[in-house]
Regions:
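Extracellular adhesion/carbohydrate-binding repeat motifs centered on closely spaced tryptophans
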Residues: 1-67
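Aromatic side chains
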Residues: 8-9, 32-33, 90-92, 99, ...
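Cysteine-centered nucleophilic/redox motifs
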Residues: 89, 123-142
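Secondary-structure boundary elements
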Residues: 63-120
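Polybasic, low-complexity, intrinsically disordered segments
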Residues: 37, 54, 80, 84-87, ...
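Generic, ordered loop/turn and secondary-structure boundary motif
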Residues: 41, 121-122
Length: 142
């Protein structure tokens, strides 16, 4: 629900606005960031996490988000605990890719994860950065 241009989460019964402390929260399978005033962060980022117009975490890349959602749908289910889902994501990454020598990232580089994850999803092979990037985005989505 939007009030005065700020997004708030309405409880499942539809009668009250849920209150959350400042910080990251998992709500209905999505990750959200709540600001000091109780509203949800939208169309912005906090440190390394980006949130869309609905306040939900996104990689910022629709293609990558689609790959991640498809992979998670293939290896997890709603009956799993968070730990089981994380293990399933790890096994998915381990079992759905092959090693391919690729150029190393420059020391101190922080922008490698997105490109590496996309490469891994698209080619089903990559170096350690590709495996790590793919797992990173899958884990964040959980």
């Amino acid at each position: 629900m939007t009030i005065d241009g700020k997004l708030y989460h309405v409880s499942k019964n539809g009668y009250a606005i849920d209150r959350y402390a400042k910080g990251l929260h998992e709500i209905d399978g999505g990750m959200y960031y709540v600001k000091e005033d109780g509203s949800f962060l939208t169309n912005s980022a906090v440190e390394y996490l980006t949130f869309d117009a609905n306040g939900r975490y996104t990689s910022g890349n629709a293609t990558l988000d689609s790959y991640v959602d498809q992979a998670l749908a293939a290896c997890t289910n709603s009956g799993m605990t968070k730990a089981q889902k994380l293990r399933a994501a790890y096994l998915y990454v381990r079992d759905h890719g092959a090693y391919l020598a690729r150029p190393h990232q420059a020391r101190g580089t922080t922008a490698w994860a997105e490109e590496s994850a996309l490469f891994m999803f698209e080619h089903k092979k990559g170096n350690c950065y590709c495996f790590a990037g793919q797992f990173l985005y899958m884990a964040r989505r959980l």
